[in-house]
Every structure is written in C-alpha cells, then in structure tokens.
Amino acid sequence: MNNLQSLSLYWPELILTVTVLVTIIADLFYSAKESGKTALWVLGGLVLTYLAIRLQDSTIVTTLFMENLAFDPYASFFKTLIILATVLVIFISQRTSELDGYRTGEYYALLAIMVFGMFLMVSAIVLIMVYLAIEVVSISSFILAGYLRRDLRSNEASLKYVIYGAFSSGIMLFGLSIVFGLAGSTKFFAIQEAMWNLEGSADFAFTLATIFILAGFGYKISAVPFHFWTPDVYEGSPTSITAYLSVAPKAAGFALIIRFFNQVFGDGASFMDPSLVTYTELPWPQLLAVLAVITMTLGNLVAMQQNNIKRMLAYSSIAHAGYMLMALPTLSSQGVYAVMIYLVMYLFMNLGAFFVVIYVKSQGGGETFDDFSGLGWKMPIVGIVMTIFMISLTGIPPTAGFIGKFYIFAAVINSGPQLYWLAIVGGINSVISLYYYMRVVKVMFFEGKSSESVIVPPFPVLLILMALAIPTVIFGIYWVPIANWVSKSLVLFTQVI
C-alpha cells in the first residue's frame, strides 16, 4: 500500500502518537505531586489502541508504507501482548516507592514511546526499519533505566545500558550494511531472493552478517553473549522498569527474530504450514541451538550464586530467553507456536515476581534474600503468591510456567532425534533452576522468626497480586483460550499478496 492508503490500517500507532503528545502537554499543567495523574492519559491511550487493534479486520494480510511494515494477525498478537504488559506495569508503577519525589509525566510518556517502538519492531520487514525500531526502544529504555537521577545505582545502570546498547547497535548496523551490499536491498524478501544466488566468499560474508545482526537481536532478548548489560541494568533500574524490560522488549525481540528468519531464510508463508524454513544452507539452526544452551546454562548457574533477588531474577530472565530459543532451531510452526504461548505465560509470572519485590521494598524491606527471611509469616498472602510465581517460573504443574515449558519441549522432541540432546540439556537446566527458585520459598517460610503481627496488603496491591497470580494458576489448568489465540495469530503475509 502507498502512504495514504496505509493510514487507514495504522490507527493503533496514530493513537499512540497522540497519546505521547497529550501526556507530555498534560504534564505541564500538573504540579510535581500530581504528575502521576499522567498515567491516566497513557492508560486511556493504550485502551483506545487496543480497541483499534480489535476493530481491525483480522483477515487482512498486507504491507504498509511502501512495503516497510507488515500488517497481519501475527503482529496484532504481539501488539496486544505489549499493551497488556504496559498496562500492568503502569499499575505496578503506581505502587512503587522508588518514584516518590520524582515527576513521572516523562516516565509514562517514555513508556508509551517504547510501546510505539515495539509496535514497529514486531511489524518491520525492512532492515532500516528494524534498526530504527530497535533504537526507539533502546533510547527510551536508557532514560527509564536511569530515571532515579539521585540514585547512583540507577545512573550506573543507565550508563552501562547506553554503552552496551551502542556496541550491539554498531555490530548490528555493520551486519546490515554487509547484507545490503550483497543483496542490493534492505527488504526481507529481496534479501531472500538474492541469497539463493550467493556463492563462495559471498556465502561466508552473508553468514557473518547474519551473526552480526543476531547480536542486535540477542541484545534485546538478553541472549548470551549479548547479555552483559542485563544484571547491572536490572539491579539498578527502578524495579517497575526492570519488570517491564524483562517482558515487553523480550517479546518484541522474539517477534522480530521469528519474522526475520521466516521471511529471509524461509518462504515467508503462513506459520500454519508445517515447514518454517526452506533455506538451510547456512548453519543458523545449529547456531541458535548452541546459543540456547549457552544462554540458559549460564543464566541458571549464575542465578544460583546471587544473594540479591532482583539480580537473581535478572539472570533468571536470561535463562528463560534460552528456553524460548530452544524452540527456534526446530524449523517448524510448532516451535513458533510454543514461543508465543511461553511469552504469554511468562508475562504474568515474571511481572508478579518483580511486583512482590517492589511491595516488600516499599514496606521498608530490601531486595536481598535476608530481607525476605520470614516473609511468609509476616505477610502470608504475599508469601503464598510469591511461592506461586516461583513454582511457575520453575515450570512445575499445575502452573502456567509448566504449560509454557511443555510446549517448548514438545516442539523440540517432535522435531526429531537430531535435537533430543537439546531437550535433555533444557531438562537439566530446569532442574538447576529449581534450586534458586525454591531457595526464595525456603527463606520466606523456613528461616527467620515467625511474626506475631500479620501485614495484609492494601486493596490496590491485592488487586494487582491477584491479577497476576490467578492467570498464573488458571492457565496452568485451562489454557485453551491462549492456545486458540496463538493459533489464530500464526499467519504471516505471503510474498504474493
């Protein structure tokens, strides 16, 4: 579609743009104490954005703005997931004490800008658009990570984030330039057509360029060895932003990786087809398998050694990126299906774990295991809910985490004997993760003195806890609605429109 025709299908992004402008202008009229009210403008904008997505014809599969963006149910799925994560984080941000004393108008406006950037990430089908989308998300993240300007840890987190982000962006941009030189185009399908004619040194150059591009993608999902920013940034950032970074950009990153490999290395067809990839001359499935093993193993082994729960959850998120990467070398629609289901389940349990950390800290506690000592007796509701999140993150039934891992392992095993070793390594890593997740439960209920006084969280906190804990349990028992939603979303636009 040309630019004017594309606007008719671009309403969600247009609403987001207006939301950002209105939020920034509205903040000018609020005092410092009232700036938190700007959250209402962003929430309203996100609700309208969601309605715009829902009202669009889900059967339309096309491209927008001169073939720069894809419009399909696959993108709509991830946009909805990103909106859900953002809405939950806005409610979580209202309950954190870390933002006290700061104007939060820019905070909520930056969240909306990040959402816009992630919308571009999940729809991009041109390398230049991929780069711009990642930069929009990254720059917003840099500012939000350092939002606590009077906190040295937050300043350090932002600085490290900028340095690592610039490094990975530079490597990715170098890879993009090589691909453009070889293919003569930045469009995914044009690159695919040119790739079939590569020979000798050109084939090697394309392999090298793909690895460089993967560095940029790996940076967004915290895959090893592009994960170095994650622990320090997660620990130093406002915990609400840490929770957000662990979920939304990770989902957008996986959406981008899947689309890139399907439309560059595959035939760009619907994911309902049994075969995801048709071009396997380059060893990228083996590369992703090794990346998955290294990512989940390092994440789990280092998480075991942490005494700070926030930092432990950072390494945990690295391990979960490894679990999701396991499904991609299967070259099948079942693998993509598994990743999408896992991301839905992961959203609730991971945001829930971080929200418990936020609430405990707001009650005068801290982020270390010692601060959680006896928490199950002092705050029984919080302790029970945290236990649910830890069990789910481990992947124990009947929780959402188990269903997510079940689909991942099923996809790997069903792909054939060549990936059985990957399933075995994944199983061993799941057992390893049991140690540090259950350590949290042990500290809460079996260490420290039992408290005579019991603290019951206020109603808004209880509401958020239940909004995260109930789906974590329900989706472990009845996940058919999620499975159906994912199935309907597994459609990519084809080369012939």
Positions of the model-derived regions?
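Alpha-helical transmembrane segments of multi-pass membrane proteins predominantly involved
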Residues: 1-497
